[in-house]
Swiss-Prot record:
Belongs to the iron/manganese superoxide dismutase family. Binds 1 Mn(2+) ion per subunit. This is Superoxide dismutase [Mn], mitochondrial. Its cofactor is Mn(2+). Its EC number is 1.15.1.1. Pfam families: Sod_Fe_C (PF02777), Sod_Fe_N (PF00081). PROSITE patterns: SOD_MN. Mn(2+) binds at H55, H103, D192, H196. Keywords: Manganese, Metal-binding, Mitochondrion, Oxidoreductase, Transit peptide. Signal peptide: none annotated. Residues 1-27 form a transit peptide. It catalyses: 2 superoxide + 2 H(+) = H2O2 + O2.
Amino acid sequence: MALRTLASRKTLAAAALPLAAAAAARGVTTVALPDLPYDYGALEPAISGEIMRLHHQKHHATYVANYNKALEQLDAAVAKGDAPAIVHLQSAIKFNGGGHVNHSIFWNNLKPISEGGGDPPHAKLGWAIDEDFGSFEALVKKMSAEGAALQGSGWVWLALDKEAKKLSVETTANQDPLVTKGANLVPLLGIDVWEHAYYLQYKNVRPDYLSNIWKVMNWKYAGEVYENATA
């Protein structure tokens, strides 16, 4: 891990400590920005190091800070019995909490090519994909098409419906987490189609980003989530 990357993360973590400590004292559970399991430049050329650094240090860090702030405000509003404030804070909690949840999944969905990123799924997940979509290639085509067609900002997901015991492709708007589409849906893969995920490298050509991100997809992680969810 580059020293600059580590230093930046330590600074972010230190800045979050006073808020987290104050929240913990009152029993409020805050969240922290997770470290990435690879260096910012490790996904090049599919995703540039600059995009990964900004995406993690700025965008995800902001969701974490704003979510924790909203939790603090909610805690105070509940203590006062301030119903209008409690209702008002729900949108900030959903948006920023969803941003944290979604990005935490997204980082694990990616892996450097040198470490197996882009290797197709095998075993149970591979068989399930063939059964539910016809082929791995058909799934990639479907997810890429739905991600490209999504208006505005959002996410495209490969989900497991635990009740139906089938895989499905879902989209969510803005930072809505997959659970908003159904409590029975387990996210196996999530692709961020907000412009901040690709614009510095791919400009306004979202399909090119969606074509290249498969080269660094961590199917091993997705397979592990699938096997745990179906055990």
